[in-house]
């Protein structure tokens, strides 16, 4: 594996990861204020392979995507889906997990499939693929963007929106914590998660090599 001396990172000796730690089970904060989740463990394993200390910076999802573009973080991991728009402004590692966009509705809702979202108010998290897909499919007027998935779910509970479109993993957690809500069986979309980096980042090859090793030795499968 690459020696840390050869790697240029935002802060010498550290792998700085931008994330949005409101996204269980990929990243969340424990009651003690520590970060945990699939992305955190994967980033830690990569940092270990590269001989770097992992530094985690928590911020809004939008800001996390921008931070690598602005050279404030080395990588962004926040359940980030590879899209053509994002590829235009950043580079991505190989995929390390698959995500599903799901629809949360109240019990008894007449929304039973993605098509039923037409004419409804849809809550999403700003900057996410759920937001992008919904605005593409139903227009910006139909979609309300919130700072976090949690806020979107609160708006659904309060009747401000008719449904929330968000990744399946946090969707299940939010529904478990909010009686009266359910996740539709039909998914809205499927997508690949990857690690985002600045355009032309020198880390891309070593991060992919580390991911390859973590897949080969079973570490990644045990995390995801």
Labelled PLM ranges:
Residues 2-5, 129-146, 182-187, 209-224:
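Ligand-binding clefts/hinges and TM-proximal coupling segments of bilobed small-molecule sensing domains
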Residues 4-79:
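Extracytoplasmic small-molecule ligand-binding "clamshell" domains
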Residues 15-19, 114-127, 142:
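Short loop->beta-strand "edge-of-pocket" segments that line small-molecule binding or catalytic clefts
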Residues 21, 97-105, 168, 172-212:
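Periplasmic-binding protein-like
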Residues 40, 56-67, 109, 126-129, ...:
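Short helix-initiation/N-cap motifs at beta->coil->alpha
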Residues 40-49, 121, 128, 194-224:
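Extended ligand-binding regions for polar small-molecule ligands
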Residues 44, 53-116, 182:
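Acidic, polar ligand-binding/catalytic clefts
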Residues 80-88, 133-135, 157, 161-189:
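A ligand-binding cleft/hinge motif common to bilobed small-molecule-binding domains
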């Amino acid at each position: 594996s690459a020696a840390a001396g050869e790697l240029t990172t935002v802060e010498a000796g550290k792998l700085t990861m931008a994330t949005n730690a409101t996204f269980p089970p990929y990243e969340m904060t424990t009651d003690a204020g520590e970060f945990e989740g699939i992305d955190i463990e994967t980033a830690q394993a990569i940092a270990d392979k590269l001989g770097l200390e992992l530094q985690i910076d928590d911020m809004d999802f939008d800001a996390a995507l921008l931070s690598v573009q602005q050279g404030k973080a080395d990588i962004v991991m926040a359940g980030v889906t590879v899209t053509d728009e994002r590829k235009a402004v950043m580079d991505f590692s190989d995929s390390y997990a698959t995500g599903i966009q799901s629809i949360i509705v109240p019990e008894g809702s007449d929304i039973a499939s993605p098509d039923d979202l037409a004419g409804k108010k849809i809550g999403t998290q700003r900057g996410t693929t759920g937001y992008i897909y919904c605005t593409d499919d139903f227009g910006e007027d139909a979609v309300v963007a919130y700072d976090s998935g949690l806020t979107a779910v609160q708006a659904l509970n309060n009747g401000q929106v008719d449904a929330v479109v968000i990744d399946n993993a946090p969707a299940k957690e939010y529904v478990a914590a909010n009686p009266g809500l359910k996740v539709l069986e039909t998914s809205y979309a499927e997508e690949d998660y990857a690690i985002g980096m600045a355009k032309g980042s020198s880390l891309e090859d070593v991060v992919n090599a580390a991911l390859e090793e973590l897949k080969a030795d079973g570490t990644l499968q045990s995390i995801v």
